[in-house]
């Protein structure tokens, strides 16, 4: 019998429902998957969840979720749900990939919203895969076949494997921030070796750009990519990145998130501001940001969400602080937040040949 590969293991419900391989390193966390922008019917009966985490996984700490999220998961899931409803009359998301799955809760949520027959989930960190497999085995319905593998973007995906929907949750963290060993998968990545890409490098979007370029060969013709990106800069920078990579793009979700791992991340962003002249947007005080966000409701109409994001960002203008100021505020005991964009992209039509 051929032995199953550790890097490409099918989720075996019977084998994974027991213990994590490193049980001493595991703990449980209560998390509510219901998005705060309207509780989707598909989440009924599964919230809250008691999920497995370890020292490598991002552990949500707001059970249930607050108006300002400490985790971006519900913002992403609501955006994916809106895109699915928008596309449902014309297209089905049957093959789905999740890049940078972390503890696997994005797979759980997507399986409930999209209900695809097949999901492939991957993360670069081997320690994360343990927790992801356990959570997926416990909370994804058996009708959905899930493959969990360790991979740096699409490096370990078989040639020719393609999808209708590819969702990514990748970090835009300063290169000098050493988070790979011992913190959380959502904030770590392998160093990239390539030249300067102007705005992509300036705003720490290189990893997202690499994903978009590689995803083109992994999408079916009518497929979609969905990127979750911390919006510490103008959204036009993100749309330009999509366009140069060959995609049309639109905002499908938007929200506010408290900066996690602030002791490490905020000084790193402040250093980038000093070194290359970038300007990153944080918001403070939280109470005022919460009040402003509650005054504006995210529209159900998908095509109106870009305008909503612009209006809310404009309303938050007087709360904006730089990363340098945000680091000082955090040092003094205050929390800061930033915006989060869920951006969907579809491939631009190929140019016709004159011949």
Language-model segments: which ranges?
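N-terminal auxiliary segments of SAM/dcSAM-dependent transferases
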Residues: 2-48
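Class I SAM-dependent transferase core
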Residues: 31-91
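Conserved class I S-adenosyl-L-methionine
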Residues: 92-102
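Conserved SAM-binding loop of SAM-dependent methyltransferases across substrates and taxa
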Residues: 103-116
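Conserved SAM-binding motif I beta-strand of class I
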Residues: 118-123
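S-adenosyl-L-methionine
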Residues: 131-160, 165-168
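Mobile active-site "lid"/loop adjacent to the S-adenosyl-L-methionine
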Residues: 161, 167-207
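Conserved Class I SAM-dependent methyltransferase catalytic core
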Residues: 202-255
């Amino acid at each position: 019998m051929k032995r199953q590969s550790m890097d490409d293991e099918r989720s075996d419900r019977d084998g994974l429902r027991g213990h994590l391989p490193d049980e001493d390193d595991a703990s449980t966390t209560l998390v509510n998957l219901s998005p705060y922008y309207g509780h989707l019917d598909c989440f009924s009966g599964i919230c809250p969840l008691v999920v497995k985490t370890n020292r490598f996984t991002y552990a949500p700490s707001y059970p249930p979720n607050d108006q300002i999220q400490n985790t971006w998961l519900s913002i992403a899931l609501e955006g994916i749900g809106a895109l699915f409803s928008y596309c449902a009359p014309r297209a089905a998301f049957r093959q789905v990939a999740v890049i940078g799955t972390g503890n696997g809760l994005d797979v759980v949520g997507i399986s409930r919203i999209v209900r695809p027959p097949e999901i492939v989930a991957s993360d670069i960190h081997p320690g994360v895969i343990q927790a992801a497999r356990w959570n997926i085995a416990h909370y994804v319905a058996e009708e959905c076949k899930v493959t969990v593998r360790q991979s740096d973007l699409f490096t370990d995906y078989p040639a020719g494997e393609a999808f209708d929907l590819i969702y990514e949750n990748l970090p835009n963290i300063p290169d000098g921030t050493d988070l790979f060993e011992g913190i959380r998968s959502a904030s770590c990545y392998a160093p990239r070796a390539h030249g300067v890409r102007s705005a992509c490098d300036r705003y720490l979007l290189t990893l997202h750009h690499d994903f978009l370029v590689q995803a083109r060969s992994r999408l079916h013709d009518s497929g979609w990519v969905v990127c979750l990106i911390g919006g510490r800069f103008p959204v036009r920078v993100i749309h330009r990145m999509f366009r140069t990579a060959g995609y049309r793009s639109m905002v499908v979700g938007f929200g506010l998130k408290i900066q996690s791992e602030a002791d490490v991340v905020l000084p790193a962003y402040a250093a980038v501001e000093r070194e290359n002249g970038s300007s990153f947007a944080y918001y403070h005080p939280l109470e005022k940001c919460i009040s402003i966000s509650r005054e504006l409701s995210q529209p159900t109409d998908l095509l109106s969400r870009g305008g909503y994001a612009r209006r809310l960002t404009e309303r938050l203008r007087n709360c904006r602080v730089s990363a340098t100021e945000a680091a000082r505020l955090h040092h003094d005991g205050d929390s800061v937040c930033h915006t989060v964009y869920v951006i969907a992209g579809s491939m631009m039509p190929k140019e016709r040949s004159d011949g």
